[in-house]
Amino acid sequence: MPKVAVYNKEGATVGEITLSDAVFGAEVNPGLLHEVVQMYLANKRQGTADTKTRAEVSGGGRKPWRQKGTGRARHGSIRSPLWRKGGIVFGPHPREYGWSMPKKARRAALRQALSAKVKSGELIVVDKFELEAPKTREVATLLKNLKVDGSAFIVTAQEDVNIYKSARNIPGVRVNAARNLNAYDVLAASKLVFTQDAVAKVEEVLG
């Protein structure tokens, strides 16, 4: 079973925690992780890009000049795709890009993403972290003490409004509750910062 150090808010080691093999020690399947990341990215797309065909562009109902006798190329409309400001051929139109994977596959991908973070030393466990009121400086100090200098994903056992409000103004830092995790958010962060209670909650949900 994988083991990781437990730190306090000051960044000092205060113990060690043994993680569940089923959740944090799963074998990583790069193909599955790639597929689930593609799914989450596809589901984020708005799909609102739109262009006008020659039938939708304003104007062009009249033949610009007679067919023969002018010495110019023949044209039937100034909104042909050949013309400047003409219609677009095979351009994008609003569509739904999203798709879904089976729940079992998504949960397996989440276990593998967490396991990959443990193996690469990118999972940090804090014994306890609570705020009485929103304070961005407190979260920034915690990350500094833990030597987190890239993007970070802070995971709490339950929804914590104070921590969420404190971290949302720090670039690259996200906060979520243990039951709301997904593989994309886990893989996107340079470091995962879990509270001990959050580790127990994740093991309860995914174990």
Curated annotation (Swiss-Prot):
Biased composition, class Basic residues, residue ranges: 63-77
Keywords: Ribonucleoprotein, Ribosomal protein, RNA-binding, rRNA-binding
GO molecular-function term, one example from the UniProt record: structural constituent of ribosome
UniProt xrefs under Gene3D superfamilies: 3.40.1370.10
GO terms for cellular component: ribonucleoprotein complex; ribosome
Highest taxon listed in the record's lineage: Bacteria
UniProt keyword annotation of Cytoplasm present: no
Keyword match RNA-binding: yes
Sequence segments annotated as region (Disordered): 47-77
Any Pfam family hit: Ribosomal_L4
One BP annotation, GO: translation
NCBIfam families in UniProt: rplD_bact (TIGR03953)
Cited function: One of the primary rRNA binding proteins, this protein initially binds near the 5'-end of the 23S rRNA. It is important during the early stages of 50S assembly. It makes multiple contacts with different domains of the 23S rRNA in the assembled 50S subunit and ribosome.
Description of how the protein assembles with itself and partners: Part of the 50S ribosomal subunit.
Protein family membership: Belongs to the universal ribosomal protein uL4 family.
Name of this chain's protein: Large ribosomal subunit protein uL4
